[in-house]
Amino acid sequence: VVLVAHSLGCILTAWWAAHTRHAAKVRGALLVAPGDVERPDLAAQIHGWAPIARQPLPFPALLVGSRNDPYCSLERAEALAQTWGARFVDYGERGHINAESGLGDWAEGHGWLQQLAAA
């Protein structure tokens, strides 16, 4: 199993990994543009997502962050990667790394996914 998570899915993945007994089935996780649910303006809009799980992930992970993501600063994304024991990629100015980012089929993301699957 290789997990792929975007935005709040990254937060959910960290929470799930901290509470499940099935993490050994996971080969890796590609975490893209996490949402900072502890940021006051976002926490007020999305109740019940904080606090963010702080345990290292029990499987290899790659976290991809953007310099101009409106939902998570690059510094915060890098700090989450460090907390979770994930490799961090500064993906430049790509917004929330979604369809609006103009990445199309996102060959680079597919390549990272293949690397995680092969690990």
Sequence positions of predicted segments:
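Residue in the alpha/beta-hydrolase core beta-strand immediately N-terminal to the catalytic nucleophile
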Residues: 2, 27-30
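Gly/Ala-rich beta-loop-alpha elbow adjacent to hydrolase catalytic centers
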Residues: 4-14
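Short, conserved loop/helix-junction motifs that constitute active-site signature segments
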Residues: 21-25, 51-58, 82-84
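Active-site nucleophile loop of the alpha/beta-hydrolase fold
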Residues: 29-39
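Conserved serine/cysteine hydrolase catalytic core
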Residues: 47-60, 107, 111-119
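Short beta-strand/loop motif that positions the catalytic acidic residue
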Residues: 57, 62-65, 69
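Conserved alpha/beta-hydrolase "acid-adjacent" motif
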Residues: 70-76
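Catalytic histidine-centered segment of alpha/beta-hydrolase-like enzymes
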Residues: 94-105
